[in-house]
Amino acid sequence: MIEMVQESSRRWGIESANLRDLGALRELERVCFPRDAWPLLDLIGVLTMPGVVRLKATGPDGRLIGFVAGDVRRTEGFAWIATIGVLPEYRGQGIGSGLLEACEARISLPVVRLCVRTDNPGAIRLYERFGYQRKGEWVGYYADGAKALVMEKYKEQECGKEGYN
């Protein structure tokens, strides 16, 4: 299923990602997270493991311009937004918001968590706009020693009307 969105006179869509997107996802990781790009095996895992919501944003030419993965942990009662990124030239068009919203909509659990570099205020603002609250920090989480801010959202309204199990 492709969801097309009209934003700032640009068209982009959101659809499921799969292993065929590995090359484009590697490039997106390299560009978006030069200090923290996921290794190849982790990318293969996120594109193939069961229980992962994986969505890509595509431009008018079908090129992958954004990606999000949500790790649904049913037995633990929550999900993690494992990664989300949008190529720099496409930022500010609502693509990150669209990816996050679409991923959350496919997660049928009441709690969603994520972590973000404490030195990434733009991403932190996005998550706060979506109702994520600061829960703590993980010191030295990133390879360069940077801290991760752990954030959490309780999807109370969604859970109440959808009847999540």
Regions found by a protein language model. Name each.
Residues 24, 125-126:
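Well-formed, non-transmembrane alpha-helical positions, independent of function
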Residues 2-3, 7-12, 16-91, 97-106, ...:
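Acetyl-CoA-dependent GNAT
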Residues 113-115, 128, 133-150:
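Conserved catalytic-core motifs of GNAT/GCN5-like acyltransferases
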